[in-house]
């Protein structure tokens, strides 16, 4: 059956299932092997990859985030993935840490940060959603984005990383007040 981002079931324990000793670890490693194989083909042609695993890991709309996974398990999972790719000699990836914004503090932003040796770019994913039609403009999104970008910029300087906006956009209601349209 089809499901959306957040209505596909209970994913609690997913990290433990795919980390070493978990029932799906072999399957996870097989996926990592596929990623590494493709990365090597790109590497042969000196093509870098900006890799953003487990993005928006502070939200609950993916199995790897929010209420489905503790902060510690989220960190372990990210670290494990990077370590496995490095063990497979993948050296053309720039790794991006990109939780969903907005953020109120550096502590808020860094809650699931896997550590400097696992990340090259510090980023944010953040969207502006309008829940009415026609949309009523508000500058709150831009104020929140500015504050979040300042936080990320400051963290990036402290950790000698690049700062970026990795995903953003605007969602508006359709005239029939159904799902978001672009």
Where is each model-derived feature located?
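Substrate-binding cleft of extracellular glycoside hydrolase catalytic domains
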Residues: 1-92
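Proline-rich intrinsically disordered, low-complexity coils
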Residues: 20, 48, 53, 99-102, ...
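Short linear motifs at secondary-structure transitions and domain/linker junctions
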Residues: 25-26, 71-73, 96-101, 137-141
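A Trp-anchored, charged/polar loop motif used as the substrate-binding/catalytic surface
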Residues: 26-38, 98-108, 145-148
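Long, well-ordered alpha-helical scaffolding segments within enzyme catalytic domains
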Residues: 31-34, 70-86, 144-159, 176, ...
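Aromatic-lined carbohydrate-recognition surfaces of secreted/lumenal glycan-active proteins
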Residues: 52-54, 78, 82-107, 160-173
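Short, glycine/charged-enriched secondary-structure capping and boundary segments
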Residues: 65-66, 138, 178-180
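Glycoside hydrolase catalytic-domain groove-lining segments
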Residues: 106-175
């Amino acid at each position: 059956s089809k499901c959306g981002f957040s209505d596909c079931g209970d994913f609690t324990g997913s990290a433990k299932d795919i980390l070493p000793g978990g029932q799906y670890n072999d399957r996870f490693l097989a996926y990592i092997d596929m990623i590494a194989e493709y990365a090597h083909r790109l590497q042969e042609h000196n093509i870098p990859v900006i890799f953003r695993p487990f993005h928006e890991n502070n939200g609950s709309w993916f199995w790897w985030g929010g209420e489905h996974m503790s902060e510690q398990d989220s960190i372990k999972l990210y670290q494990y993935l990077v370590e496995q790719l490095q063990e497979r000699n993948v050296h053309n990836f720039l790794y991006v840490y990109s939780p969903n914004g907005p953020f109120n503090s550096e502590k808020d932003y860094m809650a699931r940060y896997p550590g400097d040796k696992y990340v090259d770019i510090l980023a944010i994913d953040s969207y502006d959603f309008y829940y009415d039609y026609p949309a009523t403009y508000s500058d709150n999104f831009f104020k929140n984005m500015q504050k979040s970008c300042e936080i990320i910029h400051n963290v990036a300087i402290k950790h000698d990383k690049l700062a970026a906006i990795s995903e953003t956009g605007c969602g508006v209601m359709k005239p029939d007040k159904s799902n978001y349209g672009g």
